[in-house]
Amino acid sequence: MDDGKRGVVCSDTWGIYEAMVVCRQIGKHRAEKATLTDYYGARSLDKVIHEIHCDGHEKSLADCEYKLADRHGVACSKPVNVAGVVCTSAKLPDLMPNLWALQHSLRIEERPLHALTCAMEENCLSSSAYTARSYGSNSYSGSSYMFGAPSYGPTRKLLRFSSNIYNNGTADFRPKQHRSSWEWHSCHQHYHSMSAFSHYDILDSHGNRVAEGHKASFCLEDVECTWPRTKRYSCRGFSDQGISVGCADVYRSDIDCQWIDITDLQPGAFVFKLNVNPELEVPELNYDNNAAICELTYNGYSAKLSDCSLARG
């Protein structure tokens, strides 16, 4: 800090945005990860700062919001609260959702609950679906209409959309987990290499979640590539997974779990949010384009996305 004090930052909210500021401040290229450990030493140094928050664009920690320690000679209360960073000069990926594909793929579909077995296993439906299955009744009506014909029994109303996620960075996007930790999904017959590759949410004007979104685990592969790039990663068998530079992974609106369950949502105006790499497990060049945020208009029968823009997740 400006007063020249030597000590440590203690925080249980230390993250990649704070690490980005530190790496910039010490003249390094980019942040690879933020650490909370005394593995690198400094356990016995005085606590100088705590409860720090940065947005990642500051030039130094002094520009962030923080609280100074009110006493001298006090160390971090726990070794796991000692903040550290790992900087890198390596190339990094940069994920970005395709706004056009998202807007133009939006549609509503009603499906009987008995046809959503795999989706229920992967927790892709709102909690009322599991109650409906348990009691054998529809949470909002005794019957519904699909394609002009009555469909009796529990049904769900699904807001479907496509996710086209491009890698515009300088390195391939690879899952953090080693392949030995990948999860086999018997319903879809492939491995998921990331437990939460994207989040889907519907929010009200106050930022409160009004429809139960979900964390979508994914099998990552190259589906589309710009010339002269070629596909490298595949979901077949136990192949390497990832998204190559200049390529995109595409999850079409007709694929299981490419939806938000809006069975319990009342008509109105909302905010739709799709966020990729939401837990920042994989370092990127830029996090300010990871989310697609749109205005959602829903009248109970149809829905429309408008004014979509890229933002930080």
Tell me what each language-model feature is:
Residues 1-91:
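Typically disulfide-stabilized, N-glycosylated extracellular/lumenal ectodomains of secreted
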Residues 91-313:
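Extracellular/luminal regions of secreted and cell-surface proteins that mediate adhesion/ECM remodeling
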